[in-house]
From Swiss-Prot:
InterPro entries (alphabetical): ACT-like_dom_sf, ACT_dom, HD/PDEase_dom, HD_domain, NT_sf, PII_UdlTrfase/GS_AdlTrfase, Polymerase_NTP_transf_dom, UTase/UR
Domain notes from UniProt: Has four distinct domains: an N-terminal nucleotidyltransferase (NT) domain responsible for UTase activity, a central HD domain that encodes UR activity, and two C-terminal ACT domains that seem to have a role in glutamine sensing.
PROSITE patterns, per the entry: ACT, HD
Name of the protein this chain belongs to: Bifunctional uridylyltransferase/uridylyl-removing enzyme
GO molecular function: [protein-PII] uridylyltransferase activity; phosphoric diester hydrolase activity
Required co-factors: Mg(2+)
Reaction equation(s) it catalyzes: [protein-PII]-L-tyrosine + UTP = [protein-PII]-uridylyl-L-tyrosine + diphosphate; [protein-PII]-uridylyl-L-tyrosine + H2O = [protein-PII]-L-tyrosine + UMP + H(+)
Source organism of the structure: Bordetella parapertussis (strain 12822 / ATCC BAA-587 / NCTC 13253)
Pfam families in alphabetical order: ACT, GlnD_UR_UTase, HD, NTP_transf_2
Residue ranges of every copy of the ACT domain listed in the record: 676-762, 789-865
Upper taxonomic lineage: Bacteria, Pseudomonadati, Pseudomonadota, Betaproteobacteria, Burkholderiales
Feature: compositional bias, Basic residues: 751-767
Domain HD residue range list: 437-559
Cross-referenced SMART domains: HDc
Regulation: Uridylyltransferase (UTase) activity is inhibited by glutamine, while glutamine activates uridylyl-removing (UR) activity.
Length: 865
């Protein structure tokens, strides 16, 4: 085939597309741009076919979204080259030349070459292919062959079979996106509540003969005019968003990625407020639109199903005067029932809980609730009957989480609790929450519910035991609903939330003790986590202060339960067994303190030594065997380590009190999720730096560090580290660490050259880059001014602890204890330190500056880093 110069055609097409985009920038009307881009490509393809002819009798057809008449700025151009018979060698060469020319034009075609028989066979086996072919549109070539394809596709179309297949396909797609429209980085095309859901509804309606547009579907009685208007608006919003994503990135990008969200907000003219980022406001708009589509999708799919598979209502069974069981779905007896008696808007959810045979609500009921939600007004909220009903929903033995989720989706919960409405769809760009505030809140309620279920008792033995003994544990659900209710308002959200829950308790007639409990829980829902993860639990004063703040055993149990549920509902990455152990340790210590066991340091020391001695005897050591080692340990050591750790150290060190070589011993932690590491060697300024460098290079995440120097100058350091995700064989890892870390400590200089910092996963790095945490460092004398307390907050990154350790060494600051609190991609660490540099204002300022630089990633890069 002679060479064809495509440049003039390509330039005309590119100029026309640029003009269309410029027009869109002046008047952002999505349908106009999509239609114009489609028209431009249609014209270019018809000209191209004149230059690169189709095989004789063949047809060039647009399929998929392009066939539907929509073309996004950087979407593939989906084409079907339809042949009247299997291709000859000449036909194959013609097709090959045409496809090559498509690429030369810069169109990125998604093409298939098929005969009519091929199309029918592929459509039978793949609902996606069938759908694409149903939307085929003639572009060039044989119109007769195109009509034969249209006729064949319509002839084989079975509306009922098509509906079932598309519903299964949609369910599978939703499952790939975790069945939620509230993803951090939603795909505006494929995620639940996005463009694809809208297309599926229209495909189902079209196949069943109910129309091709929202107006036609409404005329067929499947939609009300207001629902059609809402869906049309949502469709236009999602189309524009997808267009903006393509234009912003210059590629086919349908995901609302973190690093695109600020730019998108700017395109939409959304500005940050004093308390909310512009990107958070943008995403809240997205989530509200996706929620609307998700809800109307449920109603429409059920409506189409009822039309396609009609069944008589004669098998409906009355539940009461207002509701009936219609094919295992809750159905309202009178269509205007919610308008006549708005109290039913809450009672419907209570009935769902009380009738486990119901699998959902009928489309009629869902639609009636949706259209009557405006009846929940101030008068409705003041009605004592409605207040009692709401509490009853929280007090039921089953269905609480399901119905709260359904109430949120149908906009009933946000209307009943207007303060809840403000957090619906509110994203938290704080690097550790992976859900919107409302979804996180419902996840916390779900976690509390799991504590009550016998089938989950083995997962949470202490929590299950405590909630079983807690009087009126439904109060925890109230606290959970309100614990983050004031997020995004500015100020202390815990304090503001406490005021809101106090008002709720008064309005709903909670007795004073219960009202005081939920207010305490909301006000102090972060307290237990902070103390457990940031304070030295071996210090009796820390425990006494915490116990005094909590006040009694009921509050302590409730706070423990809410704290565990809260952390576990934040992100799958935030919770780990080490945090669970810290919280359980604090609970048991505080429980003892509240029970009158106010042990002073001397009592704690004596009891701990006695228990450690008992454990060493069980290991076969005589009492006199440990004396040489214990004589080198001061009171601080015994107070900072529990009896099990002391006995473990003793078993390995009693016979080598002053070894020539470093001693490293490692064992799996008792909770089975990490490693406990002991390092015993002659003390040296860079010891902590070298050890942290090794952990970082091996992707071992330090959770806790206790640094101790014996009376005769040996370092006895203890670490809790978590192995990389997916590493199952902890004993093999322990053996490896024992060998490698000992080698590293023998030659720390070589270690500096060997250390290569690990990298964060790409998505985490992107998120932390777009929404960084402002580095903070606060240095203050500890309670008894024996040492200093350094609190730091920053975006997590590989090598951060190592960088801080280098700053300590460079400034002559000794680490006594480290409490590492990692919240997703945010760290809030506490270090107990000492050193003469901290006693002088000038050197103290230099140290703090160096710490801030290290937190920001600006520390001077040495070869070791």
């Amino acid at each position: 085939m002679p060479h064809v110069d495509l440049n003039p055609l390509k330039q005309r097409m590119q100029a026309a597309r640029a003009a269309a985009v410029a027009q869109f920038r002046q008047h952002p009307r999505p349908d106009m741009l999509l239609t114009e881009l489609r028209r431009i490509v249609d014209q270019a393809l018809r000209e191209l076919v004149k230059l690169c002819p189709l095989p004789a009798g063949a047809t060039l057809a647009a399929v998929g979204g392009y066939g539907r008449g929509e073309l996004y700025p950087h979407s593939d151009v989906d084409l079907l080259i339809l042949l009247p018979q299997p291709p000859s060698a000449a036909d194959a060469r013609a097709v090959e030349a045409l496809v090559a020319a498509l690429w030369d034009l810069g169109l990125e075609p998604g093409h298939s070459v098929r005969t009519l028989e091929d199309c029918e066979r592929e459509a039978r086996g793949d609902i996606t292919v069938e759908t694409a072919l149903l939307e085929s549109r003639w572009l060039a070539g044989s119109r007769t062959l195109m009509k034969r394809l249209d006729s064949a596709m319509q002839a084989r179309l079975d509306a009922a079979v098509f509906f079932q297949a598309k519903r299964v396909e949609m369910q599978q797609r939703h499952a790939r996106y975790q069945d939620t429209p509230y993803a951090l980085e939603p795909n505006c095309k494929e995620s639940p509540g996005g463009l694809r859901d809208l297309q599926v509804i229209l495909w189902m309606a079209r196949a069943a003969g109910f129309g091709h547009s929202w107006r036609e579907v409404a005329q067929a009685g499947l939609l009300t005019s207001s629902e059609a208007r809402d869906l049309r608006r949502a469709e236009q919003a999602f189309k524009r968003l997808r267009i903006e994503l393509h234009l912003l990135t210059g590629r086919r990008e349908d995901r609302v990625l973190f690093d695109l969200q600020p730019g998108l907000a700017a395109v939409y003219g959304i500005a940050s407020t004093a308390t909310r980022r512009a990107s958070e406001l943008l995403m809240q708009r997205y989530y509200w639109a996706a929620r609307l589509v998700t809800q109307l999708n449920v109603i429409l799919v059920q409506n189409i199903e009822e039309r396609l598979f009609p069944r008589p209502d004669s098998d409906a069974r009355l539940i009461d005067d207002d509701f009936r069981n219609l094919r295992e779905r809750l159905d309202i007896v009178r269509e205007d029932g919610f308008e006549r008696n708005p109290t039913l808007l809450l009672r419907a959810f209570l009935v769902m809980q009380q009738h486990p045979e119901l699998i959902g609500m009928s489309a009629r009921t869902l639609r009636a609730i949706w259209h009557s939600r405006h009846r929940i007004d101030a008068q409705f909220r003041r009605n004592p009957v409605n207040r009692k009903l709401f509490l009853q929903i929280l007090q039921q033995p089953r269905g609480i989480v399901h119905e709260l989720r359904r109430m949120t989706m149908l906009n009933i919960l946000p209307r009943y609790l207007p303060v809840f409405r403000r957090i619906v769809g509110q994203m938290q760009h704080d690097l550790f929450h992976v859900y919107t505030v409302d979804q996180h809140t419902l996840a916390v309620v779900r976690n509390l519910r799991r504590f009550t279920m016998p089938e989950h008792a083995q997962e949470y033995p202490l929590a299950s035991q405590l909630i079983a003994g807690l009087d009126r544990h439904w109060l925890l659900y109230v606290a959970a609903l309100f614990h983050d209710i004031a997020k995004g308002r500015g100020g202390d959200h815990s304090e503001l939330g406490a005021r809101e829950v106090r008002r709720f308790a008064q309005d709903h007639g909670l007795d004073p003790a219960d009202a005081e409990l939920v207010e305490f829980l909301v006000r102090h829902h972060l307290l237990m986590s902070a103390v457990a993860q940031k304070r030295d639990l071996s210090d009796p004063q820390v425990v006494r202060d915490f116990a005094a703040q909590v006040g009694d055993e009921r509050r302590l149990a409730a706070l423990y339960l809410l704290t565990v549920a809260d952390i576990r509902g934040t992100s799958p990455r935030v919770w780990n067994a080490w945090k669970g152990k810290l919280l359980e340790d604090l609970f048991r210590l505080a429980l003892a303190a509240l029970g009158g066991a106010h042990a002073d340091a001397h009592t704690v020391l004596t009891e701990r030594k006695d228990e450690a001695a008992r454990l060493t005897r069980l290991a076969g050591l005589r009492d006199d065997a440990r004396e040489a080692f214990w004589n080198q340990l001061d009171i601080a050591y015994f107070l900072r380590h529990d009896a099990s750790e002391i006995a473990w150290h003793t078993r390995h060190l009693y016979y080598q009190v002053a070894p020539d070589e470093p001693v490293v011993r490692v064992r799996p932690t008792e909770h089975g999720e990490g490693l406990q590491v002991m390092v015993y060697t002659r003390d040296a300024p860079d010891l902590f730096v070298t050890t942290c460098g090794y952990f970082d290079a091996k992707s071992l995440s330090v959770q806790d560090a206790r640094v101790h120097t014996t009376r005769h100058g040996w370092a006895l350091d203890s670490f809790i580290v978590l192995a990389p995700e997916g590493f199952a064989d902890l004993r093999a890892q322990a053996t490896l660490v024992e060998h490698e870390l000992a080698e590293r400590l023998r030659d720390p200089h070589a270690a500096r050259h060997a250390h290569a910092p690990r990298r964060l996963p790409h998505s985490h790095a992107r998120r932390s880059r777009v929404f960084p945490v402002m580095p903070q460092a606060e240095l203050s004398p500890d309670e008894r001014s024996q040492s200093w307390r350094l609190s730091v907050t920053a975006t997590d990154r590989p090598g951060l602890l190592y960088a801080l350790a280098r700053v300590f060494a460079e400034h002559g600051v000794d680490l006594i204890m480290a409490k590492i609190m990692t919240l997703g991609e945010r760290v809030e660490d506490v270090f107990i330190v000492s050193g003469s540099a901290l006693e002088r204002p000038r050197s103290q300022m230099q140290f703090e500056r160096a710490i801030l630089d290290a937190l920001a990633g600006d520390e001077p890069r040495q070869q070791a880093a």
